[in-house]
Amino acid sequence: IRDRSPSRGLGDVYKRQRPDWEAAGAEFTDDVSAYENMKLSLLNASHSLLSYPAFLAGYRRVDEAVRDERFARYLRLFMDRDAGPYVPAPGNTDLELYKKTLLERFGNKAVSDQISRLCFDGVSKIPVYVMPVLTKMIRDDADLERLAFFIAAYRHYLKHGKDDRGRAYEVNEPWLTEEDRKLIAGDDPVDFLGLSPFRSTDLKAADKFVSQYRSMVEGLEKDGVLSVLEKMVLP
């Protein structure tokens, strides 16, 4: 209850007396789905969006990456322009404060996380945290630049085994199928869009996404993460 998060939504299933958690800022509700959507779409998805690009750029801790203004702006743009339109504010939540607090936490060394942990098991995380937002954005003909960058970075991470500083790493993806491994090893980056975590949406049929994704793949191969990121987030 001492959590500084601006939103603490709890399902009101208590039938007997309970502590006065409202005094600490908790908000009770009969339906927590809106709070869950907010957490998955903003907090968890932002962790995923950060993971592979930051790791490839050479960062190993979340706070270090987010103190790089390029990554901080990338995440804020994702929250505001990509996920934000699909996240109605639950209850009395101040979404602007929520997003601001998330970025402050990500940059807090005292509670930082290892980026390698965020990279672990993208096959399970991406369908839950990222694909719902990407699917809606494709449907609405939104700007897909940041999501294309993320998917391209995921491919680069799985395929190459070295970050942009030349350091080798081991990929920890326990649920990759044999078909997934063939798609990763293939030369055509569009084939990668058939990977199992993307199967909720036919990404290869989304021409706008494919075009932006191809451009990101080429940029990562030629110039590296930070160069592509800088061009993407500059005003």
Q: Residue locations for each model-derived region?
A:
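Short, solvent-exposed coil/turn linker segments
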Residues: 31, 61-65, 94, 188, ...
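Single conserved hydrophobic/aromatic residue that forms the stacking wall/gate
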Residues: 1-14
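Conserved phosphate/anionic-ligand binding catalytic regions in large, soluble enzymes, centered on
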Residues: 39-54
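Short, hydrophobic/aliphatic alpha-helical segments
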Residues: 24-42
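C-terminal catalytic subdomain
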Residues: 54-176
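Active-site-adjacent bridging/hinge elements
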Residues: 16-30, 53
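Glycine-centered flexibility sites
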Residues: 9-11, 45, 58
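C-terminal amphipathic alpha-helical interaction region
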Residues: 150-152, 156-235
